From Swiss-Prot:
Keywords: Hydrolase. Coiled coil: none annotated. SMART domains: Lactamase_B. It comes from Bacillus anthracis. Belongs to the UPF0173 family. Transmembrane segments: none annotated. SUPFAM superfamilies: Metallo-hydrolase/oxidoreductase. This is UPF0173 metal-dependent hydrolase BA_4860/GBAA_4860/BAS4507. GO terms for molecular function: hydrolase activity. The lineage of its organism: Bacteria, Bacillati, Bacillota, Bacilli, Bacillales. It holds the Pfam family Lactamase_B_2.
Length: 227
């Protein structure tokens, strides 16, 4: 399984001849190396409904006939826009032809904000994502605060790589993320959701230096690891 990072919370997985994107915020993302018009994708996994995570989902899904796997309310909202969706919910798992997906808790919000009409649409509970293929497991924490049940996620799953937000302000910051890394017990931890905007500026190298009992890896946009 090849896993690459593409800025903010964008993660690409290549496995079993399939390409999976998590939270494809490409257009308007100053930290990504990807352009929506160039992306080929078979499935899109969404952690929650905020614009910096849903991103280019509708365009990508329609262009590639890709399935969008998302929490129930968000999946329903996107299906109304003509997208092929597979709704799930927290604690549920499903075996797809590209791998197994399970949604975990995340402590955050989830909504679609229409600035023009000044409306906010609730899009369900936010989630973390466990993805398993080729006997390897990736944990994408989504946007979240530190929470004690991360210990349970670590106890129940043999996590090979975890992507954890470190930006602070909207999510946990580096200090909390160090504790999260300890709790989820991943072999490798990659920081995400930082330096996209001034309010979430952090030094990822300082973060990985503080990690214990795991390998910390800072991935620049386009860099990958193989599990």
């Amino acid at each position: 399984m090849k896993v690459s990072y593409h800025g903010h919370s964008v993660v690409k997985i290549e496995t079993n001849g399939k390409v999976i994107l998590i939270d494809p915020f490409l257009t308007g993302n100053p930290k990504t190396d990807l352009k929506a018009e160039d992306v080929k994708v078979d499935a899109i996994l969404l952690s929650h409904g905020h614009g910096d995570h849903v991103g280019d989902t509708v365009e990508l899904a329609k262009k590639n006939n890709a399935v969008v796997v998302a929490p129930f309310e968000l999946a329903t909202f996107l299906s109304w826009q003509g997208v092929n969706t597979h709704p799930m919910h927290i604690g549920g798992s499903h075996e797809f032809d590209f791998g197994k997906v399970k949604f975990t808790q995340a402590f955050h919000g989830s909504s679609y904000i229409d600035e023009e009409n000044k409306t906010i649409t609730y899009t369900g509970m936010p989630a973390g994502i466990l993805f398993t293929a080729e006997e390897k497991t990736l944990y994408h924490a989504g946007d979240t605060a530190l929470f004690s049940d991360m210990k349970l996620i670590g106890e129940l799953n043999n996590i090979d790589v975890a992507f954890l937000p470190i930006g602070d302000n909207f999510t946990m910051g580096p200090e909390d993320a160090v504790l999260a890394a300890k709790w989820v017990q991943a072999k490798t931890v990659v920081p995400m959701h930082y330096n996209t905007f001034p309010v979430i500026e952090q030094d990822p190298y300082q973060f990985v230096e503080k990690l214990q009992n795991c390998t910390g890896k800072v991935l620049e946009a386009g860099e990958s690891i193989t599990l």
